Amino acid sequence: MASTLNDKRWNGALALVTVLAACTKEPATPSRACLQFSSDLMPLFAGGMIRKDFRVSNAWAVKSDSSIDSAGVKLPAYFLSADIIAPNGEAVVGTWLTTAVTQPGLVYSVSPQAKKYSTWAQTGAADKSTAGFTTASPGAKESITCVLNNRPKTSTTSIPAKP
């Protein structure tokens, strides 16, 4: 009986050590939340498209870890990705940087597609505080993934941008 009791105590101590070790591990990096871009802002956002027969839809944002310093005021930064849809229905994902997702804010083109199809200023060109924001910045690829994961199943798409 004594050996069984000792075995149980040993197993209990081992379990306690395992639990404590698990509690001291670094927490996993939280996943970046997909924030739906306000549908009320879509007409204003679409106004920046070069071709008026192109439209934007399925817009999602992910908050950046960095902020934009605009005239000494720190503003939040969000990577905004959306489908740019040609008149034939073909879609490609573009990525921009914005300071707001529920009200009008500053907008900058980040991805090659955004630069090609919209008139929004490029990051770093007009505002030096946006120079460090690229498609490789944390949050940019995640915002593209939000768009790809939330596309309607019936849309015609081209080769998606790499997340």
Task: Set out the residue ranges of the language-model regions.
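N-terminal secretory signal peptides
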Residues: 27-85
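Processing junctions and N-termini across compartments
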Residues: 17, 27-28, 140
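C-terminal motif of bacterial Sec signal peptides marking the signal peptidase cleavage site
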Residues: 21-22
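Extracytosolic low-complexity repeat regions of secreted or lipid-anchored proteins
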Residues: 79-163
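Bacterial N-terminal signal peptides that target proteins for export
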Residues: 2-12
